[in-house]
């Protein structure tokens, strides 16, 4: 029995291979027209720091108040048809929409991302709610998100553990291996995971507040 309500809102992601990550981010900061065109509430980027599938791996994300708005955005801007500097700065890999399955405090920073095949998404999400509460009670400022792909092709569930610094992210891992009281919740959640598709660390930040 689920004891939580699925929140409103959705995110879109555009996964790219950037020729120069820093220059691409600066370009987006200066040219906000694509973000304004699709009507997102907030936009940003996540740059893969470890566990890359290819050099320059990153994605652009947009937050929307509903799945309706997120889906509608696909008709308002086509990244495959981008011209000018955007076309020259990155190669589009794929895009997706994600629905958060639990409340998620959006504070982009240093994030460990697991891409998972889940056999019981709602039961897993319940465990992540318990885990987040326990980790915070242990003194860590961590946000955990569980996101279901919608129209994402072969994309799988995304689970994000977010800390405000890379060292703090590592400190949580140290606590797990030291046998912290909350570690058993993480271990119990494994029964709902059929496969860990990938495990990466990303640096995420907000770019645009619309």
Briefly describe each language-model feature range:
Residues 18-25, 64, 118-125, 163-164:
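Soluble non-cytosolic domains of exported or imported proteins
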Residues 208-210:
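Conserved small/polar residues in nucleotide/adenosyl-binding loops
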Residues 11, 15, 24-28:
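An N-terminus-focused feature that recognizes amino-terminal "leader" regions
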Residues 13-14, 100-145, 151, 158:
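Surface-exposed interaction/gating patches
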